[in-house]
Amino acid sequence: MTQSRHAHVALLPLLLILSSCGTAKVSEPPAKKQAESSTIDFSQPLVASALRERAIRTIEESADSVNPSIRANAIEAAGKSAQRFRPLIERGLTDPNLGVRAVAAMTIAKKKLSQSAPRCRAMLDDSAIQCRMAAIFALAANGIDVDPTPLADALMTDASLRVRAQAAFILGELGNQSSVPLLRQSLAATPASADPSQVKILHLQIAEAMIKLGDDEQRTGVRAALYPSRAEELEAAALAAQILGQVRDRKSISQMVYLSEYKDDTGRQHPAEVRLAVADSLALMDVRGGAFIVDSYAGSAEPAIRAQAAHAYGTIGDNASLNRLAGLLNDSDPMVRVAAADAVLRAIAR
């Protein structure tokens, strides 16, 4: 969800790479195999439509939340049906919370809402750099002339690593290959006082932008992050798994399956955030069999984990996943409900 890309002896059988055409299946413990049948058949158009309308109502309700994080997630989810939700997304541009404003502009950029983009010009004077960068993204992505210089300035000099990461993401999304040298230069420009684990996160996000712009050499470094050697590296491992799924890096499939199944000497696996990121990314690459990982966390006591599970169900997108999402739309936590709504719209649109 709002851009939330973070958090992770005996091994189960790791994987089966089944054919030369690139299909694979994650090994699944027999005791955890999913039932083939589900309660509701969402392949029926009317049934799927009813679930979609439930998701839409959830997004509408979430957009009115007093919690700005829920409002921001609702706006991002609204992007899955952007034309229907265009007024709701535009309303976010004037939200009192800077995060909500930024997400609204980023959604206009990513969904290329050309009718809404001119409304972002006023945000170029926003007090928050996150909003100004999002406005530049929205305008540029929709073909409106705008000075991109603040993106480069933020990438190279901003005190916040999160701001630098946002700048890198936008440069990657805009698709201008001339940004690659700047992104490469930024790898050496991080503040010396910064937390090394957070610098690693930033470098992975810069690498993702460079991969999107055609620099495939960066894939190797991202794959290397799939091998955490200490607890401080687990967040980077989860992010690396997410990035490799986004860029469809099939060479990393075996590494990701290993990451999801690894157990230390005490039999403990990596944290839920890591394993769910792997399951989500493998589903993006059509690797079957990872739903049992998601099932094991869908009932977690932690809402953030249930929300991440909902996102993964949306990526898997099969009938069993839609049945689980139908239940998560009734979750007691609003963050989980809006995550489930987002996932339903993604799954049904497939």
Model regions: which residues?
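C-terminal motif of bacterial Sec signal peptides marking the signal peptidase cleavage site
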Residues: 17-20
